[in-house]
UniProtKB/Swiss-Prot annotation:
InterPro entries attached to this UniProt entry: Cbr1-like_FAD-bd_dom, FAD-bd_FR_type, Flavoprot_Pyr_Nucl_cyt_Rdtase, FNR_nucleotide-bd, Globin, Globin-like_sf, Globin/Proto, Hmp
Disulfide bond residue pairs: none
Domain Globin: start-end pairs: 1-138
Cofactors (names): heme b; FAD
EC assignment: 1.14.12.17
UniProt name for this protein: Flavohemoprotein
A Pfam family recorded for this sequence: FAD_binding_6
Region of interest (Reductase), residue spans: 149-403
Keywords recorded for this protein, A-Z: FAD, Flavoprotein, Heme, Iron, Metal-binding, NAD, NADP, Oxidoreductase, Oxygen transport, Transport
Domain characteristics, as noted in the entry: Consists of two distinct domains; an N-terminal heme-containing oxygen-binding domain and a C-terminal reductase domain with binding sites for FAD and NAD(P)H.
The keyword Transport belongs to this UniProt entry's keyword annotation: yes
Gene (name only): hmp
């Protein structure tokens, strides 16, 4: 257990970590992968190449150090990390490896400043965090495998249908090989896919949001084709109906809360996928919760699920939509295909927002999430009624300790 003296040492190292955090994490990843190349099967190499993962880990380490006296303050973020780890099949034996190379990187970058008492304090702090994460993740693994239809690790699914939803987004309907019932998921959660792209030495793991209401016999994900994206290009271009993909049990903490409050769903681009699962689930359950569905797309050619959302306006009496096109095409009709020309703005959505203390869910790229945060700040929406998912590593203590 960390002593008060060790906690004080960890907190005192925050300025040094702020100054050298990204260098430490880059050094950590390079040395760990050199010694344990098998871990490259867990990590997204694109995030390594761009430095996103190094920045993300540096931010995580800083947040942990700053909250070392009261780690329970990071409870929600720890849960998000645990969900991501479970989706990657991170195991207890991975934690000592990470600890060894993280401490080695701290020692190497800080040099003479890394006194033995500093390294001992950080070893104790990391040990406590590892024990916490291992315990939480064990509970998640046991729950995932123990529920009806559940499983552990990755299992084969067959692509039953492949459907183009827009010029850049394609849906994959997945059924378990051998059949059988599937465990239900919470709308907003995601699947992890493990694929071996031809010509690549390592397995690739990616997460994709489930994009419809839960079904007992299939899952659906909807994937945006990213220019230069190794896995998305492979899924769009090579994977066909009848092919098999390895799938992990659903995970994720960006889920619809069990309340009776009005719901505001705000998305951009492929961020529409978890929102569609949420609103379809409410509609199928006959919920009385008012839903305002706000979506931003470049234009109609990339706007996925337009017809699905339009149907909801007729089938779900408590549903209202506002669609923004910031670069409408010649065939995009204002009032039919989209409701507002231009970018998402507070003035344009204020009149569509429900009365009362609504819950706000928003999903999209990091820049979009920042714009939504500014709108919610103007509306004085408290943190406990904000729920968000950002694709890619977050720049806060929300991504992952390992991957």
């Amino acid at each position: 257990m960390l002593t008060p003296e060790q906690k004080a040492i960890v907190k005192a190292t925050v300025p040094a970590l702020e100054a050298h955090g990204e260098t430490i994490t880059r050094t950590f990843y390079a040395s760990m992968f050199a010694a344990h190349p098998e871990l490259l099967n867990i990590f997204n190499p694109a995030n390594q190449q761009t430095g996103k993962q190094a920045r993300s880990l540096a931010a995580s380490v800083l947040a942990y150090a700053a909250h070392i006296d009261h780690p329970e303050a990071l409870g929600g973020m720890v849960g998000r990390i645990a969900h991501k780890h479970v989706s990657l099949e991170v195991l207890p034996e991975h934690y000592p490896i990470v600890g060894q190379y993280l401490l080695g990187a701290i020692a190497g970058v800080l040099g003479d400043a890394a006194k033995p008492e500093i390294l001992d304090a950080w070893a104790a702090a990391y040990g406590e965090l590892a024990d916490l994460m291992i315990g939480i993740e064990k509970g998640m693994y046991d729950a995932g495998a123990g529920q009806p239809g559940g499983w552990r690790d990755f299992r084969p699914f067959r692509v039953a249908r492949k459907v183009a939803e827009s010029r850049v987004i394609t849906s994959f309907v997945l059924e378990p090989v051998g059949g059988g019932a599937l465990p239900a998921y919470q709308p907003g959660q995601y699947l992890s896919l493990k694929v071996k792209v031809p010509g690549q030495e390592r397995w690739q793991i990616r997460q994709y949001s489930l994009s419809d209401a839960p079904s007992p016999d299939h899952y659906r994900i909807s994937v945006k084709r990213e220019g230069g994206g190794l896995v998305s290009e492979y899924l769009h271009g090579a994977v066909q109906e009848g092919d098999e993909l390895l799938v992990h049990v659903p995970a994720g903490d960006f889920v619809l809360q069990q309340s009776e409050r009005p719901v505001v769903l705000i998305s951009a681009g492929v961020g529409i996928t978890p929102m569609l699962a949420m609103v379809q689930t409410l509609a199928q359950a006959g919920s009385q919760r008012p839903v305002t569905f706000i979506h931003a797309a470049q234009n109609g050619s990339v706007h996925a699920f337009r017809d699905d959302v339009a149907r909801l306006t007729h089938e779900y009496p408590h549903f209202r939509k506002v669609v923004f096109y910031d670069e409408a095409g010649p065939d995009d009709q204002l009032g039919t295909h989209h409701d507002v020309a231009g970018r998402l703005s507070l003035d344009a959505v204020r009149g569509a927002l429900p009365a009362g203390e609504a819950e706000f869910y928003y999903c999209g790229p990091a820049g979009f999430a920042g714009a939504v945060e500014a709108i919610l700040d103007d509306l004085q929406v408290p943190a406990e009624r904000r729920f968000t998912e950002t694709f890619g590593p977050s720049q806060s203590f929300a991504p992952v300790i390992l991957g």
